Curated annotation (Swiss-Prot):
Taxonomic classification: Bacteria, Pseudomonadati, Pseudomonadota, Betaproteobacteria, Neisseriales
Name listed for the protein in its UniProt record: UPF0758 protein LHK_01907
Top-rank lineage group of the source organism: Bacteria
Keyword Zinc listed: yes
InterPro entries to which the protein is assigned, alphabetical: MPN (IPR037518), RadC_JAB (IPR025657), RuvA_2-like (IPR010994), UPF0758 (IPR001405), UPF0758_CS (IPR020891), UPF0758_N (IPR046778)
A biological process from GO: proteolysis
CDD domains found in the cross-reference section: MPN_DUF2466
Family: Belongs to the UPF0758 family.
An example molecular function term from Gene Ontology annotations: metallopeptidase activity
MPN domain boundaries: 102-224
Motif (JAMM motif): 173-186
Amino acid sequence: MKITDWPASERPREKLLARGPEALSDAELLAILLRTGMAGKTVLDVARQLLLEAGSLGRLLSRPVTELVSSPGLGPAKACELAVVAELARRLLAEKLPVADALTSPQAVHDYLRLAYGMRVQEVVLLLCLDARNRLLAVEEVAHGTLTESRVYPREVVKAALRQHAVAVILAHNHPSGDSGPSLADRELTEALGRALALVDVRLLDHLVISRQGCTSFAECGWLPA
């Protein structure tokens, strides 16, 4: 049965118009974007299959366009549309960061980092550079790693902080495994970076560990070096 043969109340687009986008499932929202299905499958079937294979909506939208193109039910046009949606969402959250105080609005920082980096398959280490009023100056990627780890040199972190004239910084990195719990190496790295930054009078305000499951704050857990 085609979606056009369904009762109007069950069709994704009509349901959205009647009840708003929040009433739709991930698959229904995705189906509206995709518009058409494929031989033997409705567009909703295709959307559900894409979500099932990816594991989640976040993982699906984090895939590169070259990978999306090869997914059943997608082609260059639809893959590009999905990539555009993901990028617009990232930019929307990024817009909030320059006007947000990193200390009084931590959720804006967490949301942006989780969307932009939580689904990455490689580890990335970031430095959020702040001024004397804790306003964001810049976000620098200071290290990239393999599927499981990255190598961070304190001198590179210090150079990035000084380059941005930062008074304080927030360190962040993702865990591709999906577990946002910090490792022993993360704890040791935080100690070393805290000491190195203190030598140039830059304060380490937090270290955030990001994953698709959540975000762990060293500051909230009391793990920052004294």
